[in-house]
Design a protein with these regions (language model features):
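Short hydrophobic beta-strand element within catalytic cores of glycosyltransferases
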Residues: 265, 289-292
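A short, well-ordered alpha-helix in the C-terminal region of glycosyltransferases
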Residues: 318, 332-346, 358
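Membrane-proximal helix-turn-helix segments that form the acceptor-binding/catalytic region
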Residues: 121, 127-146, 157-158
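Carbohydrate-associated surface elements
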Residues: 150, 169
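Conserved donor-binding/catalytic core segment of Leloir-type glycosyltransferases
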Residues: 183-202, 208-212, 224
Length: 374
């Protein structure tokens, strides 16, 4: 199968959708399919050979975060040329509601089109303003995929169409078999936080609020922080407890997996804006017990607390108590890790890719090719 994929978010910075697109493409290529990915990217960014840059992206607020997107008439022309230059059997557009390449690709293409909806937000100003304009383009979509029940529910309620639920994929062996970081295991306990720690919705303030209780029960505890942000500012906010913070910065996938394997607990105190929770699955694959906010998306991944502990949102005391219960009770830890090791098989990329291929098969039965719209 010759597959064209469109990613709306820039490959300049890591992100869940970018990782999903790249890893899915790699799995398909390993299986003998031909894949070309179109995505925003700067000239100085090293890209996989199957990724075509649509040009540099612009940072704009989107879904409670800052997304790096690409749009405009020049971009539209590049999309049409990319479609015309390739003889795709299917075009797979990720996040078709994002005001970037994906919206433009939906306008520019005709033929077998599959769309994956990653988010479940209804707060987008673009969608609120242009939903009527976008609806005819959404009707071009032959196959719809939602990565979670929340994203699927949004499809039904907001767009009046249904989607098959296929979760995000994870390279389970890469996390299960990762080596620990140099210097680990350390004498004390390690709690991992992963994400843009100065982005409020990631919940670092909640973890800082739990830190005094964690230090009291485990004086040698370390908060290992992986991700971008203002380190000096966070140290000031931590005050006298700043010595318990260790920063790795932005890392590659292999180092992220090693960090997860090195931690005693993975902590996800997010406040909202999550439709899935791929990092929870990665931690589960690494054999690291999870403590997470009881967001709907996290609750589903952790199977209502069977595969990880859930705590009320913005509750530092509950977060500290849950982390401590894992650190102090091997039976709790083993129960969570064992349940998680069974659950993660659902998210292994070979399983997920096969489900997506079946969607491709349903939209390509007529033998029609993807072409630039007239």
């Amino acid at each position: 199968v010759k597959i064209g994929m469109v990613c709306p978010y820039s490959f300049d910075v890591p992100g869940g959708v970018q990782a999903h697109v790249q890893q899915l493409a790699e799995v398909f290529i390993e299986r003998g399919h031909r894949v070309s990915v179109l995505a925003p990217a700067s000239e100085d960014v090293e890209l996989p050979d199957f990724v075509v840059s649509a040009g540099e992206a612009l940072a704009i607020p989107y879904n409670g975060s800052v997304a790096r997107l690409r749009f405009g008439p020049v971009t539209y022309s590049r999309i049409r040329k990319w479609i015309s230059d390739n003889d795709f059997d299917v075009l797979h557009i990720h996040e078709p509601n994002a005001p970037s390449l994906s919206m433009l690709a939906l306008k520019a293409a005709d033929g077998p089109i599959v769309a994956t909806f990653h988010t479940s937000t209804t707060k987008s100003l673009v969608l609120s303003t242009f939903q009527g304009v976008l609806r005819p383009y959404h009707e071009k979509i032959s196959g719809r995929i939602a990565v979670s029940e929340l994203a699927r529910r949004w499809q039904v309620e907001s767009l009046g169409s249904d989607a098959v639920e296929i979760p995000n994929g994870v390279d389970v062996p890469a996390f299960a078999d990762a080596a620990v970081l140099e210097g680990y295991p350390r004498p004390g306990r390690t709690v991992l936080f992963l994400g843009r720690f100065d982005e409020p919705r990631k919940g670092m303030a909640v973890l800082l609020g739990a830190l005094p209780a964690l230090v009291e029960s485990h004086p040698d505890i370390e908060i290992l922080i992986v991700g971008r942000g203002d380190e000096d500012k966070l140290r000031k906010e931590a005050g006298a407890l700043a010595s318990h913070l260790t920063f790795l910065g932005q890392v590659d996938d292999a180092t992220k997996a090693s960090a997860m394997r090195s931690a005693d607990v993975y902590c996800a105190p997010n406040l909202g804006g999550e439709s899935f929770g791929i990092v929870l699955v990665e931690a589960m694959a690494a054999g690291t017990p999870v403590v997470a906010s009881e967001l709907d998306a996290f609750r589903r991944v952790l199977r209502d607390g069977t595969c990880g502990l859930l705590v009320p949102i913005e509750d530092s005391d509950a977060l500290a108590a849950a982390v401590t219960s894992i650190l102090d009770d091997d039976a709790v830890r083993e129960r969570l890790v064992d349940a998680a090791s069974v659950a993660v098989s659902t998210y292994d990329w070979p399983v997920v890719a096969e489900q997506i291929l079946r969607v491709y098969e349903t939209v390509t039965l007529g033998g029609q090719k993807v072409r630039a719209s007239t």
